[in-house]
Amino acid sequence: MPKNELEKIFDNLPTLSYKEKLKSVENYLISLSVDDENIFYDGKRTVYPDFCKYKHTFADKMYIREMSMPRGSTGLSVIQKHSYPFFLLSGCLAATTEEGIQELIAPVYFTSPPGGAQRLVHAIEDCVIVTVHQNPTNTKDLKELEKYLYAFSWEEYEDFVNKKTKDEENK
């Protein structure tokens, strides 16, 4: 069986840790960005590339994101601050984890680890992915919601964890 695209990428970085591999991919994606209009990833915000289609839905204290990802496309997620349910409704998707590369075949769902998850994904087939996230303020402003949900660097994530720990200790 031929290796999927993620295995090819990760095999070229054998001595790096998982986070270092993702950082290397992030740096490469940043280098591909031409300008603010033609951006693949910048490590500072959520990017919704044109090759994917998105549907954003809001329910009471929930944000539901549906993404259609075409076959052959690859994407790097931001760092998730919170655990969330992930549903692959159709297609076949390869996704990196700290344990290795998983091949997910729809229909399948799982709950992400409790924060700090970042994934590199590759659509082996056309995919429809749905994720459900907390939205404690019921905002419909994606930029505001993304500040709550995501970190854009591991340093930012560590600051979030440290602040959360201090807040819990002060209760």
What are these regions (language model features)?
Residues 80-99:
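Glycine- and acidic-residue-biased ligand/ion/polar-headgroup-sensing regions
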